[in-house]
Regions:
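Phosphate- and other anionic-substrate recognition elements at nucleic-acid/protein interfaces
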Residues: 1-173
Length: 173
């Protein structure tokens, strides 16, 4: 089912890498972010908890569209592709058609300087995500007890997902 271009109750941003994360912004007020769970069963459980009680017409999912680079090792490429496929399957199994966004698109939207070394870029994005949550969102114990629970601290694992979800908010409002 194609998502409608209107205000959504929940915007979900997914950084699909094994060291990535998932972020949900509810009603543009409350935000939760989680590192990527260790296996597909935990990924399913987390996604189910995030969307529980929400009609899919009120969900919008943004997945970062990324690909392997020639310099990536075979094992890391396989692990990444497997994780990427897991997220796609989990989202599709709920009848949701995600929006795909390439990194340069959402980074340009937030004026992330091009040409930064990878670690510098990651730290810059983490700083942007910290600014966003500090000024815009409440985070609480809504999913208390979940071992992947967001505790108000942006990490390198959750920063991209937070920015992707915020990009989704900007594109749907």
């Amino acid at each position: 089912m194609k998502q409608k271009n209107c205000h959504f109750k929940k915007i979900i941003g997914i950084d699909p890498g094994k060291s990535g994360g998932i972020c949900v912004i509810e009603d543009n007020k409350r935000m939760m972010a989680y590192k990527c769970p260790a296996d597909v069963h935990e990924m399913c459980t987390l996604f189910d908890n995030i969307i529980k009680g929400t009609d899919i017409s009120y969900l919008s999912v943004y997945i970062e569209k990324v690909w392997a680079r020639p310099s990536d090792g075979r094992v890391s490429v396989f692990t990444f592709a497997q994780n990427y496929g897991h997220w796609e399957a989990i989202v599709a199994s709920k009848g949701i058609e995600p929006e795909y966004v390439i990194p340069s698109t959402w980074m340009k939207h937030f004026n992330v300087p091009s040409g930064l070394k990878k670690q510098d870029r990651k730290n810059h994005i983490k700083g942007l995500a910290n600014n966003i949550i500090s000024y815009c969102y409440d985070y609480d114990d809504y999913y208390k007890g979940n071992k992947y629970q967001f505790r108000g601290k942006v990490t390198l694992a959750t920063a991209d997902a937070i920015m992707i979800a915020r990009y989704g908010i900007d594109k749907t409002t």
